[in-house]
A protein has these predicted regions:
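Flexible helical/loop "lid" subdomain adjacent to adenine-nucleotide binding pockets
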Residues: 1-54, 67-71, 75-77
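Active-site lining segments that contact anionic ligands and/or coordinate catalytic metals
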Residues: 29-31, 67, 150-152, 160-162
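Short, surface-exposed beta-strand-loop junctions and turns on beta-sheet-rich folds
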Residues: 40, 85-87, 169-173
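C-terminal, non-catalytic macromolecule-binding modules
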Residues: 81-126
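A conserved acidic, glycine/proline-rich C-terminal tail/linker
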Residues: 130-131, 136-146
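Low-complexity, glycine/alanine/valine/leucine- and proline-rich hydrophobic stretches
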Residues: 152-163, 168-187
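Conserved small/polar residues in nucleotide/adenosyl-binding loops
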Residues: 202-203
Length: 203
């Protein structure tokens, strides 16, 4: 309420408790490694931690780098619009890292399918329907994709930015030779021309 109800006014600085302003955030970049197994984060910088411990650690690290302030206009369960100001430094870092792992371990179609499920999944939780059959059904589909998402991501943090520097996975679908644009790569220009021609026949 109060000042937050005026959308033209920024939230007061003293409202933010966990995330530093960009001006007050650390000036030095920090790199961390996050390890995933079956879609779940299991370690930070090779230190095995519980999910709660990981979130707590990343909340502290991310907050010091000015990461995770969110100021949005959202639709409540009633449909009414309201302003929401949230602090989610750990969640912001984990989302970036998980997306980086998915880009390596899931196919294009799997990523599209999983992403199409997320709005419905999020709405069910937002509306308090965690125990609903719909949420359980969606969870099974999402968990099926997650079984492939294992590996490590190196993340750089600086002044509100979360940057993926490198990633590796035993389930990687990336083939350096096939992906090469060099002449010795897996696909030649003629291969691509033939592919484009074949696809054009179906549209």
């Amino acid at each position: 309420g109060g000042v937050l109800e005026d959308l033209s006014t920024p939230p007061p600085e003293d409202m933010w408790l966990k995330v530093k302003s960009i001006e007050d955030a650390k000036d030095e970049a920090e790199e961390i490694k996050i390890t995933f197994e079956n879609g779940d984060p299991i370690a930070v910088d090779d230190e095995s931690l519980s999910a709660a411990e990981i979130l707590k650690k990343l909340n502290l690290i991310g907050g010091n780098h000015g990461i995770g302030r969110i100021d949005i206009v959202e639709s409540r369960a009633t449909g009414m619009k309201s302003r929401g100001c949230y602090e989610t430094p750990g969640g912001t870092i984990l989302l970036k890292a998980r997306r980086a792992m998915e880009s390596l371990c899931l196919s294009r179609d799997e990523i599209v399918k999983k992403d199409s499920l997320m709005p419905s999944y999020a709405k069910l939780i937002y509306d308090g329907l965690w125990w609903s059959n719909d949420r359980v059904s969606l969870q099974k589909q999402i968990d099926n994709f997650a079984t492939k998402v294992s590996g490590s991501v190196v993340i750089k943090l600086l002044k509100g930015n979360v940057i993926s520097l490198g990633k590796e996975s035993k389930n990687s679908l990336y083939d350096e030779n096939k992906a090469s644009f060099e002449e010795s790569g897996g696909f030649s220009n003629q291969d691509m021309q033939d592919y484009i021609k074949a696809v054009s026949y179906t549209h």
